[in-house]
């Protein structure tokens, strides 16, 4: 088991809950609210679900959240439910698609031996390493701030995550 800081665990656990919400609860709503989809499920799947099993489908979950995000009131204005669903969709996409493929800030920094700074001919390498490290720290700080902003955004819509 690898050690992970609490702040990282907090981020992962909360976005895991968002993922579960979309892929199970919203997917379930998409199936049970559509007679055609429900009927298209194999009988053994319907039986398992009727006995309390869990239904998971990313496609059905996203379809339901998109439908929810398109809801408007009688004046054609997006409802609060729709606005929250749009935020849910955006956060889900960020967590499952964008964030996993962002750059590793420390990949650009070469492994470096601190003892190299003692050798005169290695001082230039030391300066380059310090510059690379500074850029990595800045990128890591920006990514951490992005993570925090998204986590705060998730907390703002948490009361809307129900079906």
Walk through the language-model features, giving the residues of each.
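Long, non-globular targeting/processing and low-complexity regions
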Residues: 1-157
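Long C-terminal interaction/binding lobes of large macromolecular proteins
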Residues: 163
